[in-house]
Swiss-Prot record:
Core subunit of respiratory chain NADH dehydrogenase (Complex I) which is composed of 45 different subunits. One of its GO terms (molecular function) is NADH dehydrogenase (ubiquinone) activity. This is NADH-ubiquinone oxidoreductase chain 1. Belongs to the complex I subunit 1 family. It is found in: Mitochondrion inner membrane. It comes from Osphranter robustus. Its EC number is 7.1.1.2. Pfam families: NADHdh.
Length: 318
């Protein structure tokens, strides 16, 4: 029974990720005054399936001087971690309801660094290694702010359980009370998922394709799926943390619908940002975090610690 539940959980995520690639190409197309994919199937709807068939039927090549085991393990690890992150997310019911759901997600997002580092090192290519080192430095740096923001949210919520956030936000979304945190969280998720304008790891003019430059066929598709699964997972997390879930005990199916709509809107914002903003310089990227975000998140964390003490109150879930 658990295997069936797992398949019913993973297959829709993979389908959503596949069609997100089509949505991205369509959105970017219309924003650049062109149509995007429109040949394969009606309105180009079968394009993701054609891409998947093409990638997974090609011969997976690897450089002669590469480290075989790490080269193969890295994309598998990336996709496994990207899909595992979804397990504690309440939609409105999680596959596994964890007491420490927030810590679990933070730990898994930290582990994804290893797949990037291994792929860059195992490829035995200077471009791949530089891209991997950039990605690792960027991901680790922005995880600091993500962790402090999650700590602040946990202090308001009174629990590490994600499901309790739904109850906390029954009357008011947390984005209203904590909008500076929400803003910094959203920008940090852009950097965490290596998306524009923070896609320094894939600077085409200098690094070709970044850490996955030597990958082709199936392993490359795995990295691609992992990246887009992480994007959707991060936006789902944003929806849970700051936009509640409009809990309605009488019409429970509407909870999932509202959650999906919020996640789709946040994902569309990711695509809009990619079409609108140029790439940051690497020193600007690090300056934004260490000089701007980190002091502000620490100050806000202290603020959220001091409020319950000053008002002699406790968070709602304790």
């Amino acid at each position: 029974m658990f295997v069936i539940n797992l398949l019913l959980y993973i297959v829709p995520i993979l389908l959503a990720v596949a069609f997100l690639t089509l949505v991205e190409r369509k959105v970017l197309g219309y924003m650049q005054f062109r149509k995007g994919p429109n040949i394969v199937g009606p309105y180009g709807l079968l394009q993701p399936i054609a891409d998947a068939v093409k990638l997974f039927t090609k011969e997976p090549l690897r450089p002669l001087t590469s480290s075989v085991s790490m080269f193969i393990i890295a994309p598998i690890l990336a996709l496994t971690l990207a899909l595992t992150i979804w397990t504690p997310l309440p939609m409105p019911h999680a596959l596994i309801d964890l007491n420490l759901g927030l810590l679990f997600i933070l730990s898994l997002s930290g582990l994804s660094v290893y797949s990037i580092l291994w792929s860059g090192w195992a490829s035995n290519s200077k471009y791949a290694l530089i891209g991997a080192l950039r990605a690792v430095a960027q991901t680790i740096s922005y995880e600091v702010t993500l962790a402090i923001i999650l700590l602040s949210i946990m202090l308001i919520n009174g629990s590490f359980t994600l499901k309790n956030l739904i109850i906390t936000q029954e009357n008011m979304w947390l984005i209203v009370a904590t909008w500076p945190l929400a803003m910094m969280w959203y920008i940090s998720t852009l950097a965490e998922t290596n998306r524009a304008p923070f896609d320094l790891t894939e600077g085409e003019s200098e690094l070709v394709s970044g850490f996955n430059v030597e990958y082709a066929a199936g392993p490359f598709a795995m990295f691609f799926l992992a990246e887009y699964a992480n994007i959707m997972a991060m936006n789902a997390m944003t929806a849970i943390l700051f936009l509640g879930s409009s809990l309605n005990h009488n019409l429970s199916h509407l909870n999932t619908l509202s959650f999906m709509l919020k996640t789709l809107f946040l994902t569309f914002m990711f695509l809009w940002i990619r079409a609108s903003y140029p790439r940051f310089r690497y020193d600007q990227l690090m300056h934004l975090l260490w000089k701007n975000f980190l002091p502000l998140t620490l100050a806000l964390c202290l603020w959220f610690i001091s409020i319950p003490i000053a008002l002699s109150c406790i968070p709602p879930q304790i």
